[in-house]
Amino acid sequence: MNFLLAGIGASIGAMLRYAITNYGKKHWEWIGNKFSNLPTPTLFINLTGAFILGFIFGIKTNVFIYAIVGTGVLGGYTTFSTMNTELVELYKSKNYRGFIFYALSSYLGGLILVFVGYYLAILF
């Protein structure tokens, strides 16, 4: 049952990521250009996913919610491989400032937001 829930959740997460990525490419390009050509949609997706995952862990819900939201939706929503591919592209284009900023904001920002989500959930 959890296997099926995770699969359904992953489909939902992937569709959300697709929609947000396309929306972000049209409407958030100015943000990325202002900050060394950062891939803003991927950064937004991964940081919000980290926050939500921390929150889900913090509310101590049942295993079905973990399967559908934590593993499924957020597994399909967030993207580690795209982020790293974008980091390589920033490096190859000699955009070292963008590379460092994107790496730090993705890895460190994601870790911080997991903790923020977790501790906010504990308050509720």
Swiss-Prot record:
UniProt-listed GO biological process terms: cellular detoxification of fluoride
Cellular component GO terms held in the UniProt record: plasma membrane
Transmembrane segments: 1-21, 36-58, 63-85, 104-124
Activity regulation description: Na(+) is not transported, but it plays an essential structural role and its presence is essential for fluoride channel function.
Domain of life: Bacteria
Its membrane topology: Multi-pass membrane protein
InterPro entries: FluC (IPR003691)
Disulfide-linked positions: none
Annotated binding of Na(+), by residue: G75, T78
Subcellular locations according to the entry: Cell membrane
The keyword rRNA-binding belongs to this UniProt entry's keyword annotation: no
Pfam families hit by this protein: CRCB
Chief location bin: membrane
GO molecular function (one): metal ion binding
Role: Fluoride-specific ion channel. Important for reducing fluoride concentration in the cell, thus reducing its toxicity.
Name of the protein in its database record: Fluoride-specific ion channel FluC 2
Phylogenetic lineage: Bacteria, Bacillati, Bacillota, Bacilli, Lactobacillales
